[in-house]
Amino acid sequence: MAKLYFYYSAMNAGKTTTLLQSAHNYRERGMRTLILTPKLDHRAGSGVVASRIGLRADGRIFERDTGLQQLVERDIHNDGALHCVLVDEAQFLSRAQVWQLSEVVDRLRVPVLCYGLRTDFRGELFEGSQFLLAWADELEEIKTICHSGSKATMTVRVDAQGHAVQDGPQVEIGGNERYVSVSRAEFKKIMRGEGRIDPLQIALPLPVA
């Protein structure tokens, strides 16, 4: 039975690597997949999904107002049977798009695998993540480690000096130099201004100011 899956984590846990491996596993068995990627994430090039370890694949771009159920229906009409839809950076989905993906599962009987962040740099849920957590059939955390050795569950945005950025837009694309995964305790610490973090040396502990 087709299901809606949400694989969530903090930054740098290997979400995109896992997505690309899943897509490869389907294709290896002669099954066709469709990878969806948000237009605003163009770090690897428009329509390209790429992991930090070098894996890459072409994806279909969607915008915030794209009807995803209709997109999938057109894909099936044009290219034939579809065995899986995979969504990269799923935190950027709108509420309506999460519902549309649930319709892909329930009406079209195509499994949908979504990969994304759970919370933003303020510790608040993204819209897409909020409704995936509410509506997905299966939830799975992809784990990663904080420099403190604890499980990283939060993402902090830092400036060039390694200090926490607490204001600004929720959606701002950046790589390892802007965002760092930390435990909840370390998140509280740096948000209080107690030290700094070097985003290029994420193994180092936070020094106390």
Curated annotation (Swiss-Prot):
The protein's Enzyme Commission number: 2.7.1.21
Gene Ontology MF annotations: ATP binding; thymidine kinase activity
Pfam families the record matches: TK
NCBIfam families, per database record: PRK04296.1-5
Catalytic residues of the enzyme: E89 (proton acceptor)
Binding positions (ATP): S9, A10, M11, N12, A13, G14, K15, T16, D88, E89, A90, Q91
SUPFAM superfamilies referenced in this protein's UniProt entry, alphabetically: Glucocorticoid receptor-like (DNA-binding domain), P-loop containing nucleoside triphosphate hydrolases
Residue spans crossing the bilayer: none
Gene name, Swiss-Prot/TrEMBL: tdk
Compartments where found: Cytoplasm
Keyword vocabulary terms for this entry: ATP-binding, Cytoplasm, DNA synthesis, Kinase, Nucleotide-binding, Transferase
Gene3D superfamilies in UniProt: P-loop containing nucleotide triphosphate hydrolases (3.40.50.300)
Coiled-coil boundaries: none
InterPro entries assigned: P-loop_NTPase (IPR027417), Thymidine_kinase (IPR001267)
Single GO BP term: DNA biosynthetic process
Catalytic reactions on record: thymidine + ATP = dTMP + ADP + H(+)
GO CC terms, sorted: cytosol
Quaternary structure annotation from Swiss-Prot or TrEMBL: Homotetramer.
The protein's name: Thymidine kinase
Lineage: Bacteria, Pseudomonadati, Pseudomonadota, Gammaproteobacteria, Lysobacterales
Chief place where the protein resides: cytoplasm
Amino-acid biosynthesis is among the record's keywords: no
